[in-house]
């Protein structure tokens, strides 16, 4: 594919032209249930020939071998020479560093849960907020009665969300990978005036920066700097789930991610991950449909569309390819 075709960086002798895939009556009927989730692509009328060619394309370009390499920790971010480490947090037996980070976070979550507080005020933006928000609404009972989430730097937001609170009876969580995100730091300082650092916890990969800022050492919850922000819900960033629902539910969430990884690694072209990719490429590259609609009918999943939007657009909207070319 060329860069004009949505930046698909794969080589192939196959001729992916729309005229080759006009027989939509002879389409695949992919319906599969995995771990309680139903996947039904039958109504998309993806031609069998396109599906066959897409499988060949994946095999020619060793897509599954490349994913296995990323999963195993090979360098995927060539620009910064970094691995993609969010997989480690959800593995059954992660490397010691990631296991220690999860265990430390769970220890802190247990300590916080036993404190007497009225509200948790959570400061974060982008992936540091969208993931925890989705998990909170989906998995935590009465989430918004227990948590105030602040994600911008508009004083109107601070006033509306915190003016009625007794800040001395609040726990403050600052979620920022770099701990230098302007919106997050400015909003935290606007609300607290830096007066409640003993009841403030920083979830960050910048431990030195947190110490310099004044966060007590015991209140700094680290996670790996190679974990991308949009994938950070698998890291200690999701401490809210552990605080309010406990270790068992948090580990159950990680286990679900692990099962999805294993399904792709083991079932390959039969996995929902592969088939949803086939669906997207067919709609985007062949039919030239540039809009994806996500309807979340379940109230608890009302923030899924926002999370999925950032996840896909930030992942696929890069202007630099893997060879560092614009």
Question: For the regions a protein language model found, what residue spans apply to each?
Answer:
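Extended, charge-enriched "interface" segments that sit outside catalytic cores
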Residues: 2-114
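Glycine-rich oxoanion-binding loops at beta->alpha junctions
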Residues: 91-112, 135-171
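Conserved beta-strand elements of the Class I
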Residues: 119-123, 171, 201, 293
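Conserved phosphate/anionic-ligand binding catalytic regions in large, soluble enzymes, centered on
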Residues: 120-134, 231-239, 305
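A glycine- and small-aliphatic-rich helix-loop capping segment at beta-alpha/alpha-beta transitions
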Residues: 130-145, 164-166, 189-195, 214-220
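Extended, hydrophobic alpha-helical segments in both membrane/secreted and soluble proteins
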Residues: 131, 158, 174-192, 200-202, ...
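Active-site phosphate/pyrophosphate-binding segments
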Residues: 187, 194-326
């Amino acid at each position: 594919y060329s860069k004009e075709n949505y930046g698909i960086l794969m080589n192939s002798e196959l001729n992916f032209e729309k005229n080759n895939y006009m027989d939509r009556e002879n389409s695949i009927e992919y319906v599969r249930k995995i771990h309680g989730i139903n996947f039904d692509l039958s109504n998309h009328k993806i031609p069998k020939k396109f599906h066959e060619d897409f499988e060949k394309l994946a095999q020619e370009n060793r897509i599954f071998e490349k994913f296995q390499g990323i999963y195993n920790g090979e360098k995927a971010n060539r620009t910064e020479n970094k691995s993609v480490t969010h997989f480690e947090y959800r593995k059954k037996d992660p490397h010691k560093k990631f296991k220690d980070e999860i265990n430390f976070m769970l220890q802190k979550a247990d300590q916080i849960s036993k404190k007497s507080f009225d509200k948790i005020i959570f400061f974060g933006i982008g992936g540091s907020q969208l993931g925890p928000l989705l998990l909170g609404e989906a998995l935590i009972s009465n989430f918004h009665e227990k948590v105030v989430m602040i994600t911008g730097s508009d004083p109107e937001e601070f006033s509306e969300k915190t003016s009625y609170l007794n800040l001395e009876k609040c726990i403050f969580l600052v979620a920022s990978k770099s701990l230098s995100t302007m919106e997050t730091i400015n909003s935290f300082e606007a609300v607290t005036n830096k007066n409640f650092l003993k009841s403030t916890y920083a979830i960050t990969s910048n431990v030195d920066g947190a110490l310099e800022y004044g966060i007590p050492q015991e209140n700094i919850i680290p996670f790996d700097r190679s974990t991308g922000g949009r994938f950070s819900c698998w890291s200690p960033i999701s401490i809210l789930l552990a605080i309010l629902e406990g270790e068992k539910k948090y580990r159950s969430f990680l286990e679900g991610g692990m099962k999805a990884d294993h399904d792709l690694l083991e079932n390959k072209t039969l996995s929902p991950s592969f088939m949803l990719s086939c669906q997207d490429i067919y709609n985007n590259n062949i039919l030239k449909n540039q809009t994806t609609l996500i309807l979340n009918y379940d109230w608890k999943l009302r923030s899924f569309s926002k999370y999925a939007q950032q996840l896909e657009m930030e992942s696929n909207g890069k202007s630099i390819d893997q060879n560092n070319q614009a």
